[in-house]
């Protein structure tokens, strides 16, 4: 530790760039998606993780999510939130990245897992939206028409008589 004035400066934490958690991120050739993911994971750049978190792979996953959603639901969706996608990719990477030296096979495995997990969240949302749109476009037919019919004027009170009802008259002998 180093003392500057009355302040103690912790030298273990990088003071020149407090967002640099680990790894060699001074290399300007790293893509922002790779840098963000590696900072989350506290890993140094390596061929497999830089390829997995590359812009090309993120775009591939986005396109695959759009096409698979179209195939399963016939709905067109837009690209998903990239920050959430990177977090999902990082979670899958931490759980299932058993890299055996074959980058293509490892990428194929992890991409399949990421796409499957994302679709588990996307498809129910799209189906719920489709049901909402369908129900919102139909007239109300929930069987509660009698309960929700338009109100009647209060001046009509007492003018309706139930059939089969005989009022009792106490004054009658």
Curated annotation (Swiss-Prot):
It is found in: Virion. Its main location: virion. Keywords: Capsid protein, Late protein, Virion. One of its GO terms (cellular component) is viral capsid. InterPro entries: P8_CR (IPR043916). Induction: Expressed in the late phase of the viral replicative cycle. One of the minor capsid proteins that constitute a network internal to the major capsid proteins and outside the lipid membrane. The minor capsid proteins glue and stabilize the capsomers. Interacts with the major capsid protein. This is Minor capsid protein P8. It comes from Paramecium bursaria Chlorella virus 1.
């Amino acid at each position: 530790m180093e003392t500057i004035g009355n302040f103690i400066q912790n030298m273990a934490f990088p003071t020149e760039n407090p967002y640099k958690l680990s790894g060699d991120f001074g290399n300007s050739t790293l893509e922002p998606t790779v840098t963000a993911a590696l900072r989350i994971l506290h890993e140094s750049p390596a061929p497999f993780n830089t390829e997995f978190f590359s812009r090309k792979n993120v775009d591939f996953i986005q396109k695959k999510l759009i096409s698979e959603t179209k195939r399963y639901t016939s709905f067109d969706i837009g690209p998903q939130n990239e920050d959430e996608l990177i977090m999902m990719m990082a979670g899958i990477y931490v759980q299932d990245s058993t890299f055996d030296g074959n980058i293509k096979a490892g990428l194929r495995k992890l991409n399949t897992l990421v796409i499957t997990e994302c679709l588990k969240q996307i498809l129910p949302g799209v189906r719920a939206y489709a049901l909402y749109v369908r129900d919102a476009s139909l007239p109300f037919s929930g069987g509660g028409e009698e309960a929700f019919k338009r109100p009647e004027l209060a001046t009509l009170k007492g003018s309706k008589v139930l059939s089969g009802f005989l009022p009792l008259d106490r004054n009658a002998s």
